Amino acid sequence: MNFGFLGTILTILLVVGFITNVVLAFVIIFLERDRRTASSTWAWLFVLFVLPVIGFILYLFLGRTVSKKKMEKNNGDELNAFEDLVQDQIDSFDKHNYGYINDQVIKHRDLIRMLLMKQDAFLTENNKIDLFTDGHKLYEKVLEDIYNAQDYIHLEYYTFELDGLGKRILDALETKLKEGLEVKLLYDDVGSKKVRLSKFKHFRALGGEVEAFFPSKVPLINFRMNNRNHRKIIIIDGQIGYVGGFNVGDDYLGLGKLGYWRDTHTRVQGEGIDALQLRFILDWNSQSHRPQFKFDQKYFPKKIGDKGNAAIQIASSGPAFDLHQIEYGYTKMIMSAKKSIYLQSPYFIPDQSYINALKMAANSGVEVNLMIPCKPDHPFVYWATFSNAADLLDSGVNIYTYQNGFIHSKILMIDDEISSIGSANMDFRSFELNFEVNAFIYDEDIAKQLRQAFEKDIEQSKLLTKEVYDKRPLSIKFKEGLAKLISPIL
């Protein structure tokens, strides 16, 4: 064997790898600086130079960003009416001409105005909201609503598995297609990795439309592992909407290896559905190769049926957005809290400013409660979550680890007044990389229901104490340290 020749080849590969990494470092530092945080930049530089070849491969899958132009294609002037509505609402807050009947709207007008800086986060009142924390009860209602649909059904999901639950929903959708209804389904290509468009042959033959979000251009490999559509939305006839944390699949009914699945989802009736419909149309048009999906009046009908008193803003965020609205909304809520904060997130990897906000709240006398899982579904993410949560112990934050299965709920509630429920975790991936949607709800009844659900969860959780945390073995300390170091790219 010619070891000299092999050595030469290896040297050439290492030199090429080093030069490639230098070029990528230049791109990350100078060409993508407006799309990355400092922590993300440093994390990628660390990976590139510590792991020259592997770092390049990781960058291909995880490091690239998405352009705003790509996400806004096919929408043209259709957004003008919504932009005018948002501007009118901003003007009303600036001029103190409120005209709103909800007391929490006036009290939290600063948060509302901030969220209005995105065209789809307009404020609506008179919404009726139902909360779901159990997958079986949620999808029983979803299936009932699908079978009662009269005009159209739109679904957008990060994970849409074609297992027991997925097939039941697909069967219901195909039944409605046979009745002549319009049905559109948008799923994420990575989140629904077991699903391919070919699986929907019968659905499409019946007239159903389906699109994959950022599909792979190479069989079996998707080079865009980041920038995924993590949203979970259903709109039925413009009268009923769903948004929250549950995906579609048997795992979310508690039938997977993680056991019982604890999540939070909302069913909305009222004007807030228009914002969900807008979000769906924008996302569909960004991925579809068909003619533009028009903002037809039938998708924004006059609302009928039960009306409630809840005010809602539907806030979206993603890598193509100028402002990280959901992250800003979370932080503003924390800084506004006077009495209590209730947080649930399966992944807790925010930046230091977010952690500092929680510390300041706790040190100011606000009761701060955070609930995270007791078991990992992604090991590195779990150890980073555990480390970040424990960082709050010295400030008096109550940290609970949920024991009854896996908690996937993403909620923030303050002062028994306002809350946020949706798809966004409290981590860098949700704040910076993925496309997310959350409902910011200004309603005391919903806030109190969330607190009661949280208190029920405490009964099936363990309180993490400083004494217990300090006794963790060296192996766990090592895992936490490594996970925290690379957390900006997890």
Curated annotation (Swiss-Prot):
GO biological process: cardiolipin biosynthetic process
Signal peptide positions on this chain: none
Keyword tags: Cell membrane, Lipid biosynthesis, Lipid metabolism, Membrane, Phospholipid biosynthesis, Phospholipid metabolism, Repeat, Transferase, Transmembrane, Transmembrane helix
UniProt KW Lipid metabolism keyword: yes
Domain PLD phosphodiesterase: 225-252, 403-430
Membrane topology: Multi-pass membrane protein
Gene Ontology molecular function: cardiolipin synthase activity
Function: Catalyzes the reversible phosphatidyl group transfer from one phosphatidylglycerol molecule to another to form cardiolipin (CL) (diphosphatidylglycerol) and glycerol.
Protein name: Cardiolipin synthase 1
Organism, as annotated: Staphylococcus epidermidis (strain ATCC 12228 / FDA PCI 1200)
Gene name for this UniProt entry: cls1
